[in-house]
Amino acid sequence: MSGLEALYWAQKYPEEVEAIVGLDMAVPDYYDEMNINIPIMRLGQYCAGLGITRWIPSLAESNAIKSGTLSQKEKEIYRAIFYQKTATVTMIDEAKAVKKNAGVVKEKGIPQVPMLLFISDGSGGTGFTKEKWRSIPKEYISNHNNASCIELDCPHYIHDYEYQRISEEIRSFIR
């Protein structure tokens, strides 16, 4: 959803945005096909409110904990935030509105700012095949003369896996 925010901001305030770097960001066309299950989110909210999610520690074992570079203290903080802030009212409201918001961004067209989009292999919870996940952003920027994609062979939360390469590519992009 943050990808939509970046695109919208660049559309609305083009003088404030010099470039967009997308870390496996979802462009508007993803939302045409994305299945957002609000009842499951509400169930998660209910379980979190009762503290049930704490009884299932594997729920908080995200890629950030398994594959990232968090210290032990940071992992504890991450888990505490996860247990307290799972499926909040704001998160559910955002999920309910995201398809409409994607339509607004899509209608305004692609912002004409430089873009560098990192694309995962689509695994890790996107709900798309590798081919489909990668084809949508490529198509999105296909008529943009200052945009490129870099494919990474890792799950959706690419910053947990390819942070070194991402850092190097961003440094090169902004020079």
List each model region and its residues.
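The alpha/beta-hydrolase serine catalytic core
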Residues: 38-92
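Conserved serine/cysteine hydrolase catalytic core
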Residues: 70-145, 149-150
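Catalytic active-site module of serine/aspartate enzymes centered on a nucleophile-bearing elbow/loop
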Residues: 142-175
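Short aromatic-enriched loop/helix-cap "lid" or pocket-rim segments at secondary-structure transitions
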Residues: 31-37, 128-130, 163
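Gly/Ala-rich beta-loop-alpha elbow adjacent to hydrolase catalytic centers
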Residues: 2, 6
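Flexible "cap/lid" loop of the alpha/beta hydrolase fold
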Residues: 11, 21-50
